[in-house]
């Protein structure tokens, strides 16, 4: 399976490299006339089809399961382009705690799970409650901390589009954001958690009564044999926890396949560098990949 995945990745990257060259290099006269920064932006634009090819090849190899042992998750990639190199790495956003669960009408289980995650990460529980209030439908019960700033902001409540929104939460420092960010995502409300790619803190948070060591045992089991289904996860987690494992913090929670991914792209051209994050959706039924959001990184 590893060899098959590797071959599929090579095929995907070869096809994608041709696309990259076509998009980014095609008109050499035009490229010669533009600045290096503009040229790097073109190279980064070409990263989307590269990532799409890799994710589509993974879906074609097996659409029933996504896990951390697959090539897209374990290997970065780089493609030489003209005078530069485009590199990137893909992550599964469904392996993270979906903050928008906190905006549902029945958010009690999600709120409890999020508080457990905050504690497991060593963050102030008051910060966790402020995040929960930020996403509460209708907005925070006490909006004064938002209005009483040097530059007042609004907090309408409800779902958020990106986790960058967390920077508006009262008490959210850059250090706290950097600690929390790798474990959370902002996905559509009904999106489930892929238990094959979730971190130990996230798994411990969504399993009431589980300690971090229990989640780490699950990760060891998962490394040996990824969970084949939500039922398989519940059964194996139940054995470790010695109790029945329920659905989790939101409707249709536990899954073993993913739709939502992110990719960090980096291009080097001569002595210059430029980076971008892109967010993507991959159709469960067709494997078609669509870019949904992008952000240039400093």
Region annotations inferred by a language model:
Residues 1-298:
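Compositionally biased linear targeting/interaction segments
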């Amino acid at each position: 399976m590893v060899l098959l995945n590797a071959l599929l990745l090579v095929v995907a990257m070869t096809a994608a490299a041709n696309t990259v060259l076509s998009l980014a290099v095609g008109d050499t006269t035009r490229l010669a006339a533009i600045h290096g920064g503009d040229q790097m932006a073109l190279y980064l634009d070409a990263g989307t089809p590269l990532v799409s090819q890799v994710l589509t090849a993974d879906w074609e190899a097996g659409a029933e399961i996504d896990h951390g042992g697959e090539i897209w998750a374990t290997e970065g990639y780089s493609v030489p382009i003209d005078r530069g190199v485009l590199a990137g790495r893909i992550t599964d956003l469904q392996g993270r705690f979906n903050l928008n669960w906190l905006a549902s009408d029945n958010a009690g289980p999600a709120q409890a799970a999020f508080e457990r995650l905050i504690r497991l990460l060593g963050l102030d529980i008051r910060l966790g409650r402020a995040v929960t209030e930020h996403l509460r439908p209708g907005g925070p019960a006490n909006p004064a901390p938002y209005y009483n700033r040097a530059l007042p902001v609004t907090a309408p409540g409800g779902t958020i589009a990106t986790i960058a929104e967390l920077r508006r939460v009262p008490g959210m420092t850059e250090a706290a954001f950097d600690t929390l960010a790798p474990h959370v995502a902002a996905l559509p409300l009904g999106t489930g958690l892929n238990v094959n790619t979730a971190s130990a803190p996230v798994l411990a948070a969504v399993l009431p009564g589980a300690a971090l060591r229990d989640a780490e045992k699950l990760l060891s089991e998962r490394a040996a044999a990824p969970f084949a289904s939500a039922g398989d996860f519940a059964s194996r987690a139940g054995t470790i926890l010695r109790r029945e494992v329920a659905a989790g913090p939101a409707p249709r929670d536990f899954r073993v396949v993913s739709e939502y991914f992110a990719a960090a792209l980096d291009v080097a051209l001569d002595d210059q560098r430029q980076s971008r994050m892109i967010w993507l959706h991959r159709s469960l039924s067709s494997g078609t990949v669509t870019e949904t959001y992008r952000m240039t990184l400093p």
